């Protein structure tokens, strides 16, 4: 225990120095306008540390609060978080889903009460098959969406019970309904008009996707919006994600030449 404490005391100033070095590297560079977060690895982190399932999502919830502050302070205007996929919504055991939704609700309560939302004028929205969520959670979501509806400086989008394929399918169905009802003609159908049928028609394309836990995939996350995203995969599990990991992701983004498919 004493050895671990000594090691921590020794590494802390080195960590802070490295954080400062990274900050000096990125502070004057271009920032992504829209950052997408896939916070993966809560359960594996808990298992490796002999912690409970509840601990896994508690520390994941705490980390998300911390990272959102980092992103807002950095100046990121649009943030989308992959909170819960449709696959997990449908396949996870009920006791685990209960824990997950408990901390989602706690996070929504924080958004209702935290002055940082008002300070940065963060507009909050939620996308996905929200009808699958518990009614009390839906009520909290509606409250925070309504409370922040007039803010326009920043935007936080929560993807809950969300799947990229399902969103595109739902958009196609709505488009076909409008076509059958004469509300749109074939010549008017293009990328711009198609976007209007998504869950959030105002959601911008994502510039940078950050995924934790070492998994190198996007897992059905906003498939349309990540078509030209830069991807950054971090080895750390989500509860271990540090500010230097975020700075590294930003530095990586700044070093890339974006061709948008050209």
UniProtKB/Swiss-Prot annotation:
Active site, per annotation: 40, 88 (proton acceptor)
Keywords: Magnesium, Metal-binding, Transferase
Recorded catalytic activity of this chain's protein: geranylgeranyl diphosphate + 7 isopentenyl diphosphate = tri-trans,hepta-cis-undecaprenyl diphosphate + 7 diphosphate
Needed co-factor(s): Mg(2+)
Swiss-Prot/TrEMBL GO biological process terms: polyprenol biosynthetic process
One Gene Ontology MF term: prenyltransferase activity
Pfam families reported for this sequence: Prenyltransf
Gene3D superfamilies reported in the protein's UniProt record: Decaprenyl diphosphate synthase-like
Cofactor note: Binds 2 magnesium ions per subunit.
Annotated positions binding substrate: 41-45, 85-87, 92, 211, 217-219
Family classification: Belongs to the UPP synthase family.
NCBIfam families documented for this protein: uppS
Assembly information from the UniProt record: Homodimer.
Protein name: Tritrans,polycis-undecaprenyl-diphosphate synthase (geranylgeranyl-diphosphate specific)
Native organism: Saccharolobus solfataricus (strain ATCC 35092 / DSM 1617 / JCM 11322 / P2)
